[in-house]
Amino acid sequence: MRRLIIIASLFMNLCLPMGTQASNGGNVSPDPNFQIYLCFGQSNMEGNAAIEDIDRTGVNPRFVAMYAVDDEKAGWKKGQWHTAVPPQARPDTGLTPVDYFGRKMVDNLPDSIKVGTITVAVGGASIDLFDKRTCKAYLKKQPDWMKNFASQYNGNPYARLIELAKIAQKQGVIKGILLHQGETNN
């Protein structure tokens, strides 16, 4: 039940009508052919599996991911789209279900459809980390390693997901949420 409330909360925060402002000051509608999926959760969503060479090749350019963190060494800039070559969550993570979700989507959708994903995940974290009401209190009680991962999202993974979703919404349409939550909330 708590998961449903959190997912509903995400949708309510994101479903406000938002057009983008063109340089000429006019409204530009988001591209209805750009489908965006918000992805969050624990270690498997973060990318716990090893990335092999085959995972880095053949990614259709219609499958893109938005960087959720800045990483100068890896060349990542938060809020920018890139072809969805793994890793998705952070530069030091692995293969996620998102990698093949996006590939399957573009393989089975018309060529006019582009798929974008935004992944914000922290292994071992409770769903409380993605609840705006409990995130800060939950994180205070966690070990330093988890705080370090969360710090890459400015200490609030929920807020980062919402921030990036609002950026993405200016270009496309949020079509769904992928949540992979496991051992901490079973």
Regions found by a protein language model. Give the residues of each.
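Positively charged n-region of N-terminal signal peptides that target proteins for export
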Residues: M1-L4
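General helical structural elements
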Residues: I6-I7, M66
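Bacterial N-terminal signal peptides
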Residues: I7-C15
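Sec/Tat signal peptide C-region and signal peptidase I cleavage site
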Residues: M18-Q21
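Cell-envelope and extracellular/periplasmic
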Residues: S23-N186
